[in-house]
Amino acid sequence: MKHTFLQVALGGALGSAARYGVNILAGRLTPGFPLGTLSVNIAGCLAMGLLAALLAHRGGQHLAPFLLTGMLGGFTTFSAFALDTMTLWERGEIATALGYVLGSVVLSLAAVIAGLTVGRGLFA
């Protein structure tokens, strides 16, 4: 169990650092819009689906704490999503905030579905 906590911690550190890098880059591309958070949530959901399918079909469940809980848990974030939404809302950008919520939820669910579908096809 001690090793599992270390796997989650290491994966979380790597995932969080990657998210930070994406947010810096995205902030330069689209100042004022939380493209970084949107991007990591969609990419992370796609990766979650793909890796969940891979680990389930290839017997790699021992990697789940590092990859899924740690790396992808650190990489994606819905707490930042909620804060970004409220920031847009409080700036009076109500339509943008609502579009961001709808786009984030729909695209993230679509990405998980795509990841699971592709992953099951590739790794079954």
From Swiss-Prot:
Identify one Pfam family in the record.
CRCB
One Gene Ontology cellular component term attached to this UniProt record is: plasma membrane
Protein task? Fluoride-specific ion channel. Important for reducing fluoride concentration in the cell, thus reducing its toxicity.
| Recorded family membership | Belongs to the fluoride channel Fluc/FEX (TC 1.A.43) family.
Positions with a binding annotation for Na(+): 73, 76
Annotated protein name in UniProt: Fluoride-specific ion channel FluC
User: What does its activity-regulation comment describe?
Assistant: Na(+) is not transported, but it plays an essential structural role and its presence is essential for fluoride channel function.
Keyword presence, Translocase: no
What gene, per UniProt, encodes this protein? fluC
Family annotation (InterPro entries):
FluC (IPR003691)
Q: Where are the transmembrane segments?
A: 5-25, 35-55, 63-83, 98-118
For the keyword Cell inner membrane, the answer is yes
Catalysed reaction(s) here are:
fluoride(in) = fluoride(out)
Q: Which GO terms describe its molecular function?
A: fluoride channel activity; metal ion binding
Top-rank taxon, per record: Bacteria
GO process terms (BP): cellular detoxification of fluoride
Membrane topology summary: Multi-pass membrane protein
